Each structure stands twice: as structure tokens, then as C-alpha cells.
Amino acid sequence: MTMVYANIFLAFIMSLMGLLMYRSHLMSSLLCLEGMMLSLFVMMTVTILNNHFTLASMTPIILLVFAACEAALGLSLLVMVSNTYGTDYVQNLNLLQC
């Protein structure tokens, strides 16, 4: 494993640890999820470029599309929770039952 892969893997692990440690606020959870998606995108792009996988060159773009959808849904949920309850605590999400 080269240093590039080790650093990207370390960024993913740090984002995962941040998600597990700072899960009380929705905004910090969303930022950690975005960090995880960004490190996955960079890891996939570097792997595809190093191994010359021409057939899998669209895979990082598809991952970015899913990351953008996840960010849009997360931010809309954040706006809804903060407008309704005034805070962005994750524990307020249990109250959003229909």
C-alpha cells in the first residue's frame, strides 16, 4: 500500500470516527458523511487511473451523483428539523414520525 492509499484510507477512518463520536448534531454527522464520500471518490479515482480500468471510469461520477443526492436530502432534513425544533440534534429525528 503506497502512501497515497494510506492517507486516503486514514481520511476515511477519521471521517468514520468523527461520525461515531460526534453524532449528537445532524450538521456534524452530515459533514462526516461527506468526508467519507469524498475519500471514497478519491480512492476510486486513483485506483481506476493507476490500473487503467477504462470500463469503470464512470463509477466515481456515479458515486458523486449519489453523494450529491445524499447531501441534498440531508440538508433538507436539517432545515426541516431546525425550523421545527430550533436545534439540529439527532434525537429530534425520532419525533418526526407520521
From Swiss-Prot:
- Give TM regions: 1-21, 29-49, 61-81
Instruction: List UniProt keywords, sorted A-Z.
Output: Electron transport, Membrane, Mitochondrion, Mitochondrion inner membrane, NAD, Respiratory chain, Translocase, Transmembrane, Transmembrane helix, Transport, Ubiquinone
E.C. no: 7.1.1.2
Species assigned in the record:
Mirounga leonina
Q: Which Gene3D superfamilies match?
A: 1.10.287.3510
Q: What does this protein do?
A: Core subunit of the mitochondrial membrane respiratory chain NADH dehydrogenase (Complex I) which catalyzes electron transfer from NADH through the respiratory chain, using ubiquinone as an electron acceptor. Part of the enzyme membrane arm which is embedded in the lipid bilayer and involved in proton translocation.
Q: How does it assemble?
A: Core subunit of respiratory chain NADH dehydrogenase (Complex I) which is composed of 45 different subunits.
The residues forming a coiled coil are none
> Where is it localised?
Mitochondrion inner membrane
Sorted alphabetically, which InterPro entries does this protein's record hold? Answer: NADH_UbQ_OxRdtase_chain4L/K (IPR001133), NUOK/Mnh_C1-like (IPR039428)
Q: Which family does it belong to?
A: Belongs to the complex I subunit 4L family.
Give the main location: mitochondrion
Q: What highest taxon heads this organism's lineage?
A: Eukaryota
The record's GO molecular-function terms, alphabetically, read:
NADH dehydrogenase (ubiquinone) activity
The major lineage groups are:
Eukaryota, Metazoa, Chordata, Craniata, Vertebrata
Q: Name one GO biological process term.
A: ATP synthesis coupled electron transport
Q: What name goes with this protein? A: NADH-ubiquinone oxidoreductase chain 4L
